[in-house]
Amino acid sequence: MSLEERMRKAERTLLAVLLDPAKLDDEGARKLARAASEGGADLIFVGGSIGAGFRINEIILSVKKESNIPIILFPGNVDGVSPYADAILFMSLLNSTNPYWIIQAQALAAIPIRRMGLEAIPTAYLIVEPGQRSAAGWVGSVNPIPRDKPEIALAYATAAEMLGMRWIYLEAGSGAEAPVPSEMVRLVRERTNLGIIVGGGLRSPELVRERAEAGANVIVVGTHIEEGRDALASVREMKEALKS
């Protein structure tokens, strides 16, 4: 069974810890990998928007020394690909105003990804307000989805599904002051069959729980774990929120 199939068949919302290679050295990567493993995380995402391709292979190998959790690439560009990962979110930034982020980067990366034998998970990537002020939003030249217009997110999600994509990543941006609204998650869940990944601005167990209850298949936490005083405790509290 593929990793994607296991993700879709999971009976509960999965917790993914995001590691940004641009912000970590080997020891930092190992520390967060231990926290993810001991805290009960289900997945580790590796990637970022600026400079994340630098030493990505070394970071992933460091993570693998501390954890058996599946590693999924969350690429910010064509340099965010590694043969040492278990899968890659093969993403199209649908609400970018720059065609490079919609299809050109994907075309450049597709053949190397296939040659590496990486499992590709076709994913629509949508950046929601206030994500335009995040690194991903700035680099990706986005026209952000308004927070109070969940029907716009649904329109993109429906188009993604009709194009054959199987997942959608609703992103508010790393460290966002406000996460993706639960109502937006709920509407996409009710009106499509896409797997839903939600990330950005999820700083508390309550925010995580609300998005899980709205229908998210995967919750992604990164900045809260990286910048917190106790990474293990942070992972555990997020995991407990998904159990309740």
Swiss-Prot record:
Keyword GTP-binding attached: no
CDD domains for the chain: PcrB_like
Position of the signal peptide: none
Catalytic reaction(s) noted: sn-glycerol 1-phosphate + (2E,6E,10E)-geranylgeranyl diphosphate = sn-3-O-(geranylgeranyl)glycerol 1-phosphate + diphosphate
Essential cofactor(s): Mg(2+)
GO molecular function (one): magnesium ion binding
GO BP term (any one): glycerophospholipid biosynthetic process
Pathway named in the protein's UniProt entry: Membrane lipid metabolism; glycerophospholipid metabolism
The keyword Magnesium belongs to this UniProt entry's keyword annotation: yes
UniProt record similarity statement: Belongs to the GGGP/HepGP synthase family. Group II subfamily.
Protein's recorded name: Geranylgeranylglyceryl phosphate synthase
Organism listed in the record: Korarchaeum cryptofilum (strain OPF8)
